[in-house]
Amino acid sequence: TVCPTGALMDMTSEARGLAAMFTETHSTCNYCSWGCTVKLETKKGEVIRIEGDENYNIGINEGNLCAKGRFGHGIIHNEQRIENPLMNVGGDFQEVSWEEALRTIADRMQTTLNRSGPESLAAIGSEKLTNEENFLLQKLFRDVLGSNEVNNLANIRAPYLNRFMLDCFDNGISSQPITKLQEADVVLVFNSDLPSEYPVGGNSVRFGTVFNNTDILIANPRRVVFESEAKIDVRLTYKHGSDVAVASRLSKIIIDNGLIDVNKAKSSIDNYDELVQSLSSYTAENTEKLTRLPDDVLPRAAESFA
């Protein structure tokens, strides 16, 4: 139930019965890379219900799930789901066994390896896989096949962001748990439709606006809907493709106006002086031409964020 009085019930599942008839499995939702912990209820090998896992005090979703994570399990047993590998035979895809498919892939990889060497093989992981699955993928290519050509879809989509994270935090992940969003004074949502792409993260930010007076800064080429316009402190709707100009202008304003501890910044950022010099071209006039943003909103965003 989602209602303390039981007036609102989840009626999406056709299966009914005593609790003893169901098997519970604790796992991680794989709809996106957020990593919500879930509890699956199954009956005779079929997923009947998925709920947020609150029993073990682990995970970042605190029992919350988005609509896809909670109600999207119907695809698992959908009659149109492809359950076995399909191999292109003469232009037509024919169903084959897993053993045949894996053997074909292994043989072709070995042939390529023998002919052109390990660097001719490459792997692309996914942010929708678990950390363990991505780890095994890179282990296969680096240790077994000898290839270092390993990448991830998340890095392909946002290589500069990942490089920035590596430079700042020595790894490609955030330095704080996602739940800290609801405790922040200011949250800058940059080029992300957080409520739609990562609803549980959007909930954390909304929680902060209600209970912690968190200010939200939205920077996005699209007009992201965030429940209520009143909750957004500053909105930066810039020209598509000018992300770097927006970030650079914000950085320049923060530095020029003395809104940061320069000594701390120099100790944390290699080549700090070169960074400052690289921002010199991002004047108010040039940035407005690149982003189509009036310069009066950028100082407000910079001051709020800093």
Language-model features, listed with the residues they occupy:
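Extended active-site and interfacial segments that coordinate phosphate-rich ligands
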Residues: 43-83
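Short amphipathic alpha-helical interaction/hinge segments
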Residues: 11, 40, 74-77, 258
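Iron-sulfur cluster-binding cysteine motifs and their immediate structural context
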Residues: 1-15, 35-45, 66
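Catalytic and ligand-binding motifs that coordinate phosphates/metal ions
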Residues: 23-55
